[in-house]
């Protein structure tokens, strides 16, 4: 995958040199390039200006971003504008992006963008219902969530298929050694070696956690007959 990032602060992206994303770059599975669009600003390197019609704050000018975009070698990229008013990012969207070969992220700053910049864009995306000082942190979050889904980036594909949200439910509790730590012991079923009972326990706990913490997810989740019975039991036990 090739990712190009248009930003005023390329130095903010140093975390992408480490951990899973960094290893993906080392393996040649990922190429990330940074483009400081201030370098393409014609007007005394100014990237922002006052909005027509008045108003608070400054807007990013179209020219530096258009020229930076035009200079990128690309074929048919998905172009993502980080915008608080955009569609909210989620796991399904990360899975969609992971299928792409080329991504371009445009990171804003100041009050907003000249509206004409949006003609370059295929997707306007928000990290959530809050405002950051710029799009860099949002872009890094989306890149991290996306890159880990690329085949061969994580050793076992099943290791992310069981993640919270990938299945539509929150992930079940997990334990490792020692069996007993400060009086807190691992559930016996996980020590039993009985694969079917372990599967049922994990599914039950996943449903329980989702019902207790994110019941909104269940509104769009297609329950199996087995899951319906488990959820009914969970609700009964809560009463």
UniProtKB/Swiss-Prot annotation:
GO biological process, one term: tRNA N1-guanine methylation
Cellular localization per UniProt: Cytoplasm
EC number: 2.1.1.228
Residues annotated as binding S-adenosyl-L-methionine: 108, 127-132
UniProt key word Repeat: no
Family of this protein: Belongs to the RNA methyltransferase TrmD family.
PANTHER family registered for this protein in UniProt: TRNA (GUANINE-N(1)-)-METHYLTRANSFERASE (PTHR46417:SF1)
Protein name in the entry: tRNA (guanine-N(1)-)-methyltransferase
Record organism: Streptococcus pneumoniae (strain JJA)
Classification of source organism: Bacteria, Bacillati, Bacillota, Bacilli, Lactobacillales
């Amino acid at each position: 995958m090739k990712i190009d990032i248009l930003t005023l602060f390329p130095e903010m992206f140093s975390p992408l040199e480490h951990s899973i994303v960094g290893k993906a770059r080392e393996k040649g599975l990922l190429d990330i390039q940074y483009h400081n669009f201030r370098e393409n600003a014609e007007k005394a390197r100014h990237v922002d200006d006052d909005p027509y019609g008045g108003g608070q704050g400054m807007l990013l000018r179209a020219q530096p971003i258009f020229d930076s975009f035009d200079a990128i070698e690309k074929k048919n990229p998905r172009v993502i504008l980080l915008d608080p008013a955009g569609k909210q990012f989620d796991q399904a969207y990360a899975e969609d992006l992971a299928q792409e070969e080329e991504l371009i992220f445009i990171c804003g700053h100041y009050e907003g963008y000249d509206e004409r910049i949006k003609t370059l864009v295929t997707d306007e995306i928000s990290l959530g219902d809050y405002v950051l000082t710029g799009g860099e942190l949002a872009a890094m979050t989306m890149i991290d969530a996306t890159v880990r889904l690329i085949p061969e980036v994580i050793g076992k594909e099943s290791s992310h298929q069981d993640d919270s949200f990938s299945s539509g439910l929150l992930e079940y509790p997990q334990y490792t050694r020692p069996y007993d730590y400060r009086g807190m012991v691992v559930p016996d079923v996980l020590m039993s070696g009985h694969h079917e009972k372990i599967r049922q326990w994990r599914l039950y706990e996943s449903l329980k956690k989702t019902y207790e913490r994110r019941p909104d997810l269940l509104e769009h989740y297609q329950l199996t007959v087995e899951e319906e019975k488990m959820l009914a039991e969970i609700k009964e036990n809560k009463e």
